[in-house]
Amino acid sequence: MGAVDTSERLSKLRQLMQQHKVDVYIVPSEDSHQSEYIAPCDARREFISGFSGSAGTAIISLSKAALSTDGRYFNQAAKQLDNNWQLLKGGVEGVPTWQEWTTEEAQGGKAVGVDPSLITASGARKLAETLKKNGSSLVGVRENLVDLVWGKERPARPSEKVRVHPEKYAGKTFQEKVAELRKELESKKKAGFVISMLDEIAWLFNLRGTDIPYNPVFFSYAVITPTTAEIYVEDDKLTPEVKAHLGQDVVVKPYESIFADAQALSTKSQSAGENAAKFLLSNKASWALSLSLGGEGQVEEARSPVADAKAIKNETELEGMRACHIRDGAALTEYFAWLENELINKKTVLDEVDGADKLEQIRSKHDLFAGLSFDTISSTGPNGAVIHYKPEKGSCAIIDPSAIYLCDSGCQYFDGTTDTTRTFHFGVPTEFEKRAFTLVLKGTIGIDMAVFPKGTSGFAIDVLARQHLWREGLDFLHGTGHGVGSYLNVHEGPIGIGTRVQYTEVPIAAGNVISDEPGYYEDGKFGIRIENIVMAREVKTAHNFGDKQWLGFEHVTMTPIGRNLIEPSLLSDAELKWVNDYHAEIWAKTEHFFREDNLTRSWLERETQPISK
């Protein structure tokens, strides 16, 4: 995870910038579908900067370079950026945003360039307006300059086959989903919807792919109108089964033809006059796609109705999430029992990658296994403080049994997606480690036990996860929760729990699946995080003020919480009962996996025993 010398790459990029008459060049993290996680061929920001985190923006002027990222990645970026780069710590008071840094560098009528397919239309407009006030301009550079620097070394675009996601896991046919989308478009008087987000297309058509590691999606676009459904994907990626699945209901078109077709739709709309219905475009769609559709005057940009529908799981999907978390919980239990035995009893020397590999091996034995949902974060001691740490063979640490061990991992199963973090100490934790862990646990329980009226946002309940840390002057620099897909992306919008303004926009609704993951981190020492997946459900309350609908959470993660890190005296009676009830539930739902595995069964029995003050 060390720094890469980027001097030559930056030199070549600056030569290209001068050729294209660009003074500042922006390199976003995202691909042309604004994906958070990307295929290797789209890792442009990582290539040019050396920083491999999933979030961040690189900005290069003719004399400087800066990388902006959020609190999850401050430590990682500090280690991976060489001395050509300035780290902009997002959200830290007094540190400029990447937009502010760009504006400052572009003073005096300079041109700022960006690949228009890698930035949202709304983001481009806001930046252009800011630059205009400064006498500068934003220029769309269609030929990606980083790709030119990368050259033949750039990985090829994936060409794996697309496959059908059966109704027995999806819970609805794609025809039903398209019909519901059309009703919404009709109610909004829209001519159609152009879809660019990969997980939305996969969900809508009940299809899955492997184009992006850990995310079962495939490169595609789609256009839905009142009478037609078109999907833009390379024909050689479609198996006979997929073609039969789509049948006569969907027209398949070449992936690259979306922009020409979008221009044709724009021309047709303009010829129909001012009163013609507009096309709907997601507010996360690219500037390039928006321009092809005629820009702001020809389209309405809004939150995607498909994203909203996808986030509210049906009963089949919810049951799948329950089932896959029981299997996954059993796999994690087997792993932690194995790891403790190897470290403590056998005195085996294991590094962090050894641990991650063993966990994947155990998971792969379970029914409906379809791969991991992200790189396993297997971290010992100080590496646990690197929130999105990625261990690599040869440079990772040996797991220290006398230090805290944090493991954040997830899996894709055909019936659901998992994401679980557990923190263990296989030796004797310090009093402060126990105190910090218990404060984090109280936050986890606070979210889990929350009851709130319909219409409440994730922003509003975030304090329940942080309040106990705040009382002692502690905090964590990441969100408390993110949406989770159903055999889809492990990070799914539009809902979440956290301090970001975006979490005020969409209220939590019954059927949402969200992570509950407060943490605490001490740089250079340790990291603590406890992550469960919870499902928002309607709950019955003793009273019903205002005739409101009330919601609460049902946890589905079935993995024990490290008992020797819990300080029972810090827990209320209700919290203590929650821990004991939770561990009893885990035992009841997973012990049958280990009736012929005495090692794991004994570990599970020990870790799920009641605790008391």
Swiss-Prot record:
The keyword Protein biosynthesis is annotated on this UniProt entry: no
Reaction catalysed by this chain?
Release of any N-terminal amino acid, including proline, that is linked to proline, even from a dipeptide or tripeptide
PANTHER family assigned: XAA-PRO AMINOPEPTIDASE 1 (PTHR43763:SF6)
User: What UniProt keywords are attached to this protein's entry?
Assistant: Aminopeptidase, Hydrolase, Manganese, Metal-binding, Metalloprotease, Protease
What does this chain do? Catalyzes the removal of a penultimate prolyl residue from the N-termini of peptides.
Query: Could you say which residues bind Mn(2+) 2 here?
Result: D408, D419, E531
Homology family: Belongs to the peptidase M24B family.
This protein's GO cellular component annotations are:
cytoplasm
Cofactor: how bound: Binds 2 manganese ions per subunit.
Residues that coordinate or bind Mn(2+) 1: D419, E517, E531
The name this protein goes by in its record = Probable Xaa-Pro aminopeptidase P
| Cofactor(s) needed by this chain | Mn(2+)
The cross-references to Pfam families, in alphabetical order and at most eight, read: Creatinase_N, Creatinase_N_2, Peptidase_M24, Peptidase_M24_C
- Report any one BP term from Gene Ontology: proteolysis
> Which EC numbers characterise this protein's activity in its record?
3.4.11.9
The enzyme class is: hydrolase
Q: Output the Gene Ontology terms for molecular function.
A: metal ion binding; metalloaminopeptidase activity
